[in-house]
Regions:
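Conserved non-catalytic scaffold segment of RNase H-like nuclease domains
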Residues: 1-109, 113-116, 131, 137-154
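Acidic two-metal-ion nuclease catalytic site recognized across multiple nuclease folds
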Residues: 1-5, 146, 157, 164-193
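Conserved glycosyltransferase catalytic-site signature
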Residues: 99, 121, 156-160
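Conserved beta-strand -> loop -> alpha-helix junction used to position metal-binding or nucleic-acid-contacting
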Residues: 112-126
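Short Asp/Glu-rich motifs
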Residues: 78, 125, 163
């Protein structure tokens, strides 16, 4: 596998995974959306051989099956290539699942969970658009509709790009940088902060 991620300095990288089954460690696709200082987005995705069985439910959800990953690299091989870039940046995930999956897959291969700096774009979306609570929510599916985002849901590269776009829209709407919006220690952020 050749990495298509420039060895560059990004504002942040959004990361999304798809899994083969209900086991969080069964990553079968990793997608990244690297956001440059001018807010251009470079998207990368790769299939991953989870070395596990696939559930029919997951295959229906993302369309990836055993035949697609047979010759794909394992998670440990992918992480070895991506670690130098990921470890230098804030990583955005849409919910806590992606971090859980990366940590679980790391443990499966016998190494500690990477000490990445994670920020949750759900938290950012909740702070930017609190009115969506109880009104469709802050999941990518509803944000796609509300923010008029164009992406194919349950493709890791597309979902990573969508999470990056959510963050960029929230920054523009609130006039506050993502790391202040997504900081769990901050109680509230407003357009006047």
């Amino acid at each position: 596998m050749h990495t298509m991620i420039p060895d560059d300095n990004f504002r942040f990288i959004a990361l999304d995974v798809e899994t083969a089954c209900s086991d969080a460690a069964s990553i079968c696709q990793i997608g990244l959306a690297c956001v440059w200082p001018d807010n251009r987005i470079h998207t990368f995705s790769t299939l991953v051989n989870p070395c596990s069985d696939f559930d029919a439910f997951n295959i229906r959800l993302h369309g990836i099956g055993p035949e697609h990953v047979r010759n794909a690299p394992r998670f440990d091989e992918v992480l070895d290539l991506l670690f130098p870039v990921l470890s230098r940046h804030h990583l955005v995930q849409h919910s806590n699942f992606d971090k859980q999956a990366v940590n679980a897959a790391s443990r499966t291969y016998g190494f500690d969970a990477p000490n990445f700096h994670w920020i949750d774009s759900v938290t950012i979306a909740r702070r930017a658009w609190p009115e969506l609570k109880g009104n469709g929510g802050h999941g990518l599916g509803n944000l796609k509709k509300v923010l008029k985002l164009d992406f194919h849901h349950h493709d890791a590269g597309e979902d990573a790009r969508a999470a990056a776009q959510v963050v960029l829209r929230a920054e523009a709407y609130l006039g506050v940088p993502f790391d202040r919006i997504g900081n769990p220690d901050r109680k509230a952020v407003s357009r006047h902060d």
